[in-house]
Amino acid sequence: MEENPVKENNLTYITNEKNKTNELIKKGNFEEAEKGYKEIINFINNLKKEELTDDILNQKKLILSNLSHALTKLNRIKEAKKFDIEIIRNLDKKFSKSYARLINAYLEEKNVACARYHYSLMKEYCSKEDIQKFPEVINKIDHEIQEKDQFIQGIEAMKQIFLNK
């Protein structure tokens, strides 16, 4: 069965535009990259449901991830997190890069509880091989979890001391 030429043209257009916009990222032009990625996402969002192939949805995931990266570089972390959450919720719950970016963002905000939550989801849905691609993030969250656990143990020990007096 032949591929629908409209769908093939959409995929080609999306891929070409993504590649052009990726070049802006490589040059450090994050503002223009943001605009480019948002235009492509807008194009995809305006496609009819029957035009949304798995390949187009995969491109959407990658474009949203790249958009999140650009926004992170622009120090717009809160906005960047929304796109990573959209990827995990709506496109690919096994996309380890989004979990890693979210964990890192929450740790930067000193929100260890949210970082820990996304780390648990990452461990649930992603392969060990995928998780190992982000050693710095994993070391950081493991360290934060260990510190929090030690802090809680210290409080519990203090409670016991005061309760026994």
What are these regions (language model features)?
Residues 1-47, 144, 149-165:
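N-terminal alpha-helical interaction modules that lie
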Residues 7, 12-15, 54, 58-61, ...:
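Start-of-helix signal in alpha-solenoid helical-repeat scaffolds, especially tetratricopeptide repeats
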Residues 26-97:
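Alpha-helical adaptor scaffolds
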Residues 34, 81, 116, 123, ...:
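Conserved positions within tetratricopeptide repeat
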Residues 47-51, 94-98, 124-137:
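Boundary/linker segments of alpha-helical solenoid repeat arrays
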Residues 62-75, 108-118, 128-130, 138-164:
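Alpha-helical linker/edge segments of TPR/alpha-solenoid repeat scaffolds
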